[in-house]
């Protein structure tokens, strides 16, 4: 035997309660003898009745808005978890920490993107920055990250990974142009590949170069001019990855978006990221998690919590001498290299 429980729709309740309160106020004014009197006591009672009805309406509207805001935040949190999935603390022998902050207070997801994946070709990372921030940038972030997560397993060369990202962005921009003909969007992208021996290769399209931390020394990973951002210009024919040295055991890479160095204080001074990193590692090497916390705290102090742009940080440290990744296929590890690599799923 089935029982069907009737449930009053929330919209009916939302509209019915204010209507009932309004009807009670009008009925009191038209039908109650006390409301027809012109004495001071009658006026006080009438005013009290209408004040109570008005207060009830305001509280009802406020409660509805709070409930709707809570639902929006839950949706935003789910979107953030789907787009910028929490990174495991260890990926193929690398210690990893990342964090991001949206400049739009109404959105938990901004225009910054990052991901780190262990593949048969090495550990591959992406850091990107979509023009604009907040809700409007989510579609582009999803297109670029989705393409990256597939391409890093399929393509043996970083140049072909970058072309996959460029095609995904082009499709996204064509769809956006149909809805918004004046929309001009671009994405800065940094692709990194770290081999088993720590060798670093990179392709940079308009993004800030990361910093390499070696002991207490802080220096840019490379000083060459990057390629133009993805979107406005076609990629060049030759996309040979740039050799950037070796990430030795104990060394760290700090990837970031331009919102970090562009952050200003009340006097208009930019945030000195290299100096902040030098201060963080002056006494002793610290973990990537501590570096992220230290930099975010320094940024909040510098801007007094009023960032004008999205901020993202990603720190990778080579801990391979202290961590052995012998379990093939485990989360955050890569399978042994094969001569005929097949696409794998990112767990």
Locate each region found by the language model.
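Short alpha-helical scaffold segments that flank and stabilize functional sites
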Residues: 79, 83, 147-150
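Conserved subregion of the PPM/PP2C metallophosphatase catalytic domain
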Residues: 1-77, 81, 88, 113-122, ...
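Preference for bulky hydrophobic residues occupying beta-strand positions
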Residues: 98, 125-128, 192
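Acidic, Ser/Thr-rich low-complexity segments on the non-lumenal side of membrane proteins
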Residues: 81-119
């Amino acid at each position: 035997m089935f029982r069907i429980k009737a449930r009053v729709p929330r919209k009916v309740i939302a509209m019915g309660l204010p209507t009932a309160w309004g009807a009670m106020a009008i009925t009191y004014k038209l039908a109650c003898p006390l409301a027809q009197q012109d004495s001071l006591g009658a006026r006080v009672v009438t005013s009290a009745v209408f004040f109570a009805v008005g207060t009830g309406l305001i509280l009802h509207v406020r409660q509805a808005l709070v409930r709707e805001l809570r639902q929006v935040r839950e949706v935003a949190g789910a979107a953030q978890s789907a787009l910028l999935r929490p990174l495991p603390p260890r990926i193929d022998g690398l210690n990893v920490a990342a964090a991001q902050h949206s400049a739009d207070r109404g959105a938990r997801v901004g225009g910054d993107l990052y991901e780190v994946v262990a593949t048969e070709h090495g550990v591959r990372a992406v850091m990107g920055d979509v023009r604009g921030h907040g809700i409007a940038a989510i579609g582009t972030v999803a297109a670029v990250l989705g393409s990256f997560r597939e391409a890093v397993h399929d393509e043996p060369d970083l140049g072909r990974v970058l072309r996959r990202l460029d095609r995904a962005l082009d499709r996204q921009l064509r769809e956006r142009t149909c809805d918004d003909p004046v929309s001009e969007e671009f994405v800065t992208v940094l692709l990194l590949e770290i081999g088993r021996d720590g060798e670093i290769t990179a392709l940079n399209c308009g993004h800030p170069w990361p910093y390499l931390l070696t002991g207490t020394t802080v220096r840019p990973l490379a000083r060459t001019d990057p390629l133009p951002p993805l979107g406005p210009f076609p990629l060049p024919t030759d996309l040979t990855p740039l050799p950037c040295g070796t990430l030795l055991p104990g060394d760290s890479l700090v990837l970031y978006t331009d919102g970090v160095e562009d952050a200003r204080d009340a006097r208009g001074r930019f945030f000195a990221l290299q100096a902040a990193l030098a201060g963080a590692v002056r006494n002793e090497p610290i973990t990537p998690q501590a570096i992220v916390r230290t930099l975010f705290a320094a940024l909040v102090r510098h801007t007094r919590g009023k960032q004008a742009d999205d901020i993202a940080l990603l720190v990778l440290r080579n801990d391979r001498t202290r961590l052995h990744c012998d379990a093939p296929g485990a989360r955050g590890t890569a399978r042994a290299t094969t001569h005929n690599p097949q696409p794998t799923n990112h767990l």
